[in-house]
Amino acid sequence: MWLGLSAGICLHAGQMAGGLATVLICDDEPSLRELIRVSLIGPYRFAEADDGEQSLALARQLRPEVMILDMMMPRRSGLEVLAEIRQDEALSNTAVIVLTAQPGTREEALRQGADLVMVKPFEPEQITAAVEGVLAERR
């Protein structure tokens, strides 16, 4: 069951117990958000946003351990959201994995403070390895 917080933002009701790492999935494509969510193996709490403004608002509200952030979204690009996240002291420990379809944007995302950049398309097991890797680095 999914609980809507507002348009395009939801939390998985079965995973709201404390102690789980929160993964915020930010992408304007619902099918990709679902693919990421079902691909992640492990006990995670999920939240989703479908544009840059919602991504930033939900990050500030939930303070996720990991953000999976698409580069190209409406209402704010992934780079704009990433810049805001990196300037927000309350979110300084959030690991950010940037998704892009344009390999040439990798360097810019890393300069802006991304922990990892993944080029689309990717295999489902790659997203699990990426999330586990950035979480291990933060611990």
Show which residues each predicted segment covers.
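His-Asp phosphorelay/catalytic-motif detector in bacterial-type signaling
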Residues: 63-65, 90-95
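Acidic catalytic/metal-coordinating carboxylates
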Residues: 51-54, 65, 77-83
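Two-component/phosphorelay signaling modules centered on CheY-like receiver
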Residues: 30-47
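Alpha4 helix (beta4-alpha4-beta5 surface) of REC/receiver domains from two-component response regulators
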Residues: 80, 102-118, 129
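Active-site residues of response regulator receiver
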Residues: 70
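The feature encodes the CheY-like receiver
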Residues: 74-75, 92
